[in-house]
Amino acid sequence: MTSFRAWLCTLKVYTQPASLRMLALGFSAGLPLLLVLGTLSFWLREAGIDRTTIGYLSWVGLAYAFKWVWAPLVDRLPLPGLTRRLGRRRSWLLLSQLLIAAGLLGMASQNPQLALTPMVWSALVVAFGSATQDIALDAYRIESASMQEQAALAATYQTGYRLAMIWAGAGVLWVATLAQGAQLGYAVRAWQVAYSVMAACMVVGIVTVLLSPEPQPRPLPPSRSVQEWLHSALVAPFADFIARYRWQAALVLGLIAVYRISDVVMGIMANPFYVDKIGRAHV
């Protein structure tokens, strides 16, 4: 009985408000990734876009690999109007989620057979907003709970993230198939409906941010000038890291900068292969 109670106490942490918030925010974070990578390549190939062009379009996903470049700005830069009302973390979360929703609606309004460039720009907006959301969400998670609670928050975050990836992968194909009905062949309207549904799903994250408390912010040193602010936000973190680890810092920073590139650029070509071989109905 004691062991059973111990298990109940362990599982109870996952029903706490903080854990449920991270479940919803994890869903919001995981939703856009496939929609600008694997799922988008599926749509484009079914629309008859050649594989070379699809390969080039995978470069929009490099926003995830290089998000460390603007991470210091997200960490320190206040947003006029929003930061005063929501706080530093929630303001960036809300802005990034609105960017993602707007970008997905932009993608849903396009026909890649007629005009591919607007879709690329919309996908860039989604990728940039998603990468920015990842930055702000990591900071929010770390600052909103004690060290003892971080494991539970990370677990619920990953659960929400993986559920969203299933929805943004298989779920999109299911919605598109329902929207297509009995029509045979490629139907752009089906994909537009599916991406519109995905944009609507971003409401999960937006509502969660608006209802969540802002974590206690850590104090930032005052900056007397723009130059000093830029130095403390962009230069000082890297300088401190290099001072601590010296030559090993270059290896670590290099790995951080490039480890996702192969996954982002090469993994996107799997779905065009499936479309060519078996088609959407059998995937």
How does the language model describe each region?
Residues L33, A65, V125-L137:
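Core transmembrane helices of Major Facilitator Superfamily
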Residues T53-P80, I100:
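Central cavity-lining transmembrane alpha-helices of secondary-active solute carriers
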Residues L79-P80, S91-L114:
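C-terminal ends and interior cores of transmembrane alpha-helices
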